[in-house]
From Swiss-Prot:
<dbReference type="InterPro" id="IPR003136">
    <property type="entry name" value="Cytidylate_kin"/>
</dbReference>
<dbReference type="InterPro" id="IPR027417">
    <property type="entry name" value="P-loop_NTPase"/>
</dbReference>
<dbReference type="Pfam" id="PF02224">
    <property type="entry name" value="Cytidylate_kin"/>
</dbReference>
<keyword id="KW-0808">Transferase</keyword>
<keyword id="KW-0963">Cytoplasm</keyword>
<comment type="similarity">
    <text>Belongs to the cytidylate kinase family. Type 1 subfamily.</text>
</comment>
<dbReference type="GO" id="GO:0005829">
    <property type="term" value="C:cytosol"/>
</dbReference>
<dbReference type="InterPro" id="IPR011994">
    <property type="entry name" value="Cytidylate_kinase_dom"/>
</dbReference>
<dbReference type="GO" id="GO:0015949">
    <property type="term" value="P:nucleobase-containing small molecule interconversion"/>
</dbReference>
<dbReference type="GO" id="GO:0036430">
    <property type="term" value="F:CMP kinase activity"/>
</dbReference>
<dbReference type="GO" id="GO:0036431">
    <property type="term" value="F:dCMP kinase activity"/>
</dbReference>
<dbReference type="GO" id="GO:0006220">
    <property type="term" value="P:pyrimidine nucleotide metabolic process"/>
</dbReference>
<dbReference type="GO" id="GO:0005524">
    <property type="term" value="F:ATP binding"/>
</dbReference>
<feature type="binding site">
    <location>
        <begin position="10"/>
        <end position="18"/>
    </location>
    <ligand>
        <name>ATP</name>
    </ligand>
</feature>
<protein>
    <recommendedName>
        <fullName>Cytidylate kinase</fullName>
        <ecNumber>2.7.4.25</ecNumber>
    </recommendedName>
</protein>
<keyword id="KW-0418">Kinase</keyword>
<keyword id="KW-0547">Nucleotide-binding</keyword>
Amino acid sequence: MKKITIAIDGYSSCGKSTMAKDLAREIGYIYIDSGAMYRAVTLYSLQKGFFTERGIDTEALKTAMPDIHISFRLNPETQRPMTFLNDTNVEDAIRSMEVSSHVSPIAALGFVREALVKQQQEMGKAKGIVMDGRDIGTVVFPDAELKIFVTASAAIRAQRRYDELRSKGQEASYEKILENVEERDRIDQTREVSPLRQADDAILLDNSHMSIAEQKKWLTEKFQAAING
């Protein structure tokens, strides 16, 4: 069976990663979480004090980029990928609200996107991958055989994020999360470099009122159609 590239783009907290991980595991493809890569750079920037009262110290971050090494390893117990930053497991750390509230301005930096897009394209050369993010179908893999664009209402996405954080035992405020979701939408859609948009040949999925099982069935059907097409 031929292997293809699957690009899943969409808004923050709309379940892209869960969909992509489940699909990759089911069809035996490699899953690459592009959002985790931007979160890892954000975490590094927070740890190094690159966020100042005047904004991001872009020169310091640009100088540090060659020292930022991001990799993914499979958790043998959960069979889920874990994100490593310079050989340290940061899978939980990059999902914090602090990182969430700082990631969009980092992702809007041209030199950061350029460096990470190159890494992502290298990872996907052999096909047989599922990658989710904001610009996978438009910039990273414009020739992907299957492109999905996922959306859901901001209120529902905020509730999902709130539930996720609470399930991990983290303190969370629904109002602050909703504010963060709406702000990230604004930044993602209006940034100069690779703004969030639906590729012309992407299939739209509004999963506001769909269960995970319904999304999985829908996505599997689209994969089968792409393989047989």
